[in-house]
């Protein structure tokens, strides 16, 4: 499959990588849209993202996709669901992971399935991103491009809460 990589000099390249293999608690997702993150993606391209120094690297994290296959324990996602944040976990051949969502396919993890099978938080199998990988319900009426903006909105809302802003405050 095709993915977008960056080298240590900031050169972008469309590359071929293997289609990800999903596990029993994961689903395979076909990418529909992926936004450009001014923070993460741009820092990875310019080599300034803290502790991310192994290049070449697969880029992208603000993705939306459609579930096309799922593992036998997955209950939070159904085939055809539109989901947030499919990633490529771990290294893919010579490429390290900058989350890798600028790829044709990614993986989402079913947090409930992991937890119910003894692989919850604190285990090597679990990733905290599984909590954020959620279904975009059809009744929301969002296109895939619009849905990818939810990632940015979540980050903004998190910052507002972290700084303690309240309603009706200047």
What are these regions (language model features)?
Residues 1-2:
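Extreme N-terminal starter segment of soluble prokaryotic enzymes
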Residues 7-10, 34-36:
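Short polar catalytic/cofactor-binding loops
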Residues 10-18:
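Short glycine/threonine/proline-enriched tight-turn/helix- or strand-capping micro-motif at secondary-structure
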Residues 19-35, 48-102, 109-112:
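Glycine-rich beta-strand-centered segment in the early N-terminal region that forms part
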Residues 38-45:
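Cytochrome P450 core scaffold surrounding the K-helix E-X-X-R motif
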Residues 90-169:
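NAD(P)H dinucleotide-binding glycine-rich loop of Rossmann-like/cofactor-binding domains
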């Amino acid at each position: 499959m095709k993915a977008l990589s960056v080298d240590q000099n900031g050169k972008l390249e469309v590359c071929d990588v293997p289609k990800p293999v999903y596990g029993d608690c994961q689903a395979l997702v076909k990418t529909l849209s992926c936004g450009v993150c001014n923070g993460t993606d741009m820092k990875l391209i310019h080599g300034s993202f803290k502790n991310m120094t192994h290049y070449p690297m697969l880029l992208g994290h603000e993705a939306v996709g459609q579930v096309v296959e799922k593992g036998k324990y997955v209950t939070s996602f159904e085939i055809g669901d539109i989901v947030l944040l499919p990633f490529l976990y771990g290294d893919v051949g010579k490429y390290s992971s900058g989350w890798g969502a600028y790829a044709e396919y990614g993986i989402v993890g079913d947090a409930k399935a992991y937890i119910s099978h003894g692989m919850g938080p604190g285990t090597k199998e679990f990733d905290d991103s599984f909590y954020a990988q959620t279904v975009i319900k059809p009744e929301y009426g969002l296109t895939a491009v619009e849905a990818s903006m939810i990632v940015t909105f979540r980050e903004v809302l998190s910052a507002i809460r972290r700084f303690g802003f309240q309603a009706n405050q200047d």
